[in-house]
Amino acid sequence: MATKRHALIKRREAVGHTQETLAAAMDVDRTTVGRWESGRAIPRPWMRPKLARQLRVNADQLDKLLAPEPSAVPSAVPPPHPKPETSLRVSLVQAVATDSAESALFINFASATNVDTILLEQLDADVSRLALEYVSKPLPDLVHQIGALRSGVFELLRGRQRPHQTIRLYLTAGRLSGLATHVALDLGHYAVAATHARTAWLCAESADHDGMRAWVRSAQSLIAYWQRDYALAAHLASAGMPFADGGTIGARLLSLQARAAAALGDGPAALRAIEAAADARTGPGLNELPGIFSFPEAKQWTYAGTALLALNSSSYVGRAIAASTRAIALYEGAPSLDQSSGDLLAGHLDLANAYLARGDGDAAQESLTAVLTASPDRYTASIARRLNTLSNRLSSPVYSGSSLLSGLRENVREACSRPALTTTPEPSP
């Protein structure tokens, strides 16, 4: 039997709404509001934030307004002069009735949820779409979508769900925090990125998801790498390996180890990690999302090229050129949604540096065409740093005698001066 929600009615009246005006504000029929108040229906999860705003309450307060009100348990009236054994029986009946009412209330509590299967599936689909679009679309097109969806999931987690639904929400929140980490990384806001990464780790722990734990360690390794803490970058990548659960995450972590080891000047460790990464690739994992959460072969070759070039030895220049060339070819041959603009530009910059190391200015200039003609909104923090490093390199006396490289130097300087994503100041995390 439905129980009238008196608290909901009182709150609606307290804020000045009639059933008709509340229905109009909610874009529903008046009878729908009537069913909510009579206990014969309950607002769907996606309607609750709007209803909470209309009633000027938060999500938890709305849950209490919508909770069924317990029916009063009729108490037995004792006879004027009860016998001791009769009073005992009455007390026992009352105790049993009270226990029954408490069980009924707990059933209502335990079965209440602010999500359903359809909503969870939609969240999964939205995260997959954003993860895929992140690698190929300009960052300004996605940053607000990522933030809004993440805030919505956090708000859902402040409500009540069944345990398996809460686990799924934590995993979704972790993935969205991972996307937020990459947004901050691409802007060069490393302290903010570290905060988002810690949030992602907390969510991975709450969801007890090894794949997400491993991915977060890879993101934290990236942050350390671009902060030039190469020892920490290598350590974090190594710390993620025990959580690698198949798919491409093992190759990602080993490739990160290779780059960090090369930056530290540890050639043998870098070469071992490059080879191990090639062996670790097993294809997409069972629960591996696309885009930013996967590690395509092209990206692996990009990392290998960077690592080989960082060894700063003529012995590895040929291999670095081959790796970067392979990465570019794989990206350019991939579907447009899989073409990571950042990794493509990184590959071209590495290739140009490798050709300069070999003394081939013409090939270096050709390699840089894609970078110099790219839109400034594609210049992430890592690309901007690589460009500045190249500009400094071309300014050294060893390249001063070449008219070809003199023109290239001016083009690179001009590219470095363009307004880009990284011109925004870093906020406090």
Give residue spans per PLM region.
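Short, flexible helical or helix-coil boundary motifs
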Residues: V15, E69, D99-A104, L394, ...
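Acidic-residue sensor for enzyme active/binding pockets
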Residues: E20, E37
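Short amphipathic recognition helices of helix-turn-helix/homeodomain-type DNA-binding modules
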Residues: M1-K10, A24-T31, R35, I42-D99, ...
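Short glycine/serine/threonine/alanine-rich loop segments
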Residues: H17, V28, V57, H189, ...
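Short, cationic motifs built from Arg/Lys/His that form the positively charged side of catalytic pockets
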Residues: I9-R12, Q19
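Conserved binding/catalytic microenvironments
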Residues: S111-V115, L120, D124-P429
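Intrinsically disordered, low-complexity activation-like regions
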Residues: L105-F109
